[in-house]
Amino acid sequence: FISLILAFLVVLLVMPKAIPFLHQLKFGQEIREEGPQWHQVKSGTPTMGGIVILVAMIVSVLGAVVMGDLSTTQLSLLFLTLAYGVIGFIDDYIKVVKKRNLGLNSKQKLIGQIVVGLLFVWLSGGFTSEATYLSIPFTDFELDFGIVYPFVALFWLVGFSNAVNLTDG
């Protein structure tokens, strides 16, 4: 719980300073003219704000280390988030610094997400028979995916990552 509060406070304190700073650096994405008209108001909106979110996560994990409350699950989730964050950073970097509005193409992003997802599933034991259950919250029911679990987990990770990216953009 303390890690959650710590991450929230970091974002709350840093983001208001980061947005004008990113504006100063002209880290805004140009919006393509062929897009919807209502999307044009986003032109110049600073990109790379995800860096603040990643910093907040790192600070909260460091807080957990100080409190002696860090688990391997938290470390693997940190790896997953940072690795997906690196993909997002590369995408934004190409858009802003290289002035290529599309950033990484969809195939490059998908390959990166699949590689990261496979690493995460492997590191978290998803390829062992012990980690194939999905517990349904507030019930005693567990759904066993068996040998298809790694594929279900990978599909979920890549799908969730893209859903977050779509709603953010």
Over which residues does each language-model region extend?
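"…together with the soluble PPM/PP2C metallo-phosphatase catalytic core" -> "…together
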Residues: 1-169
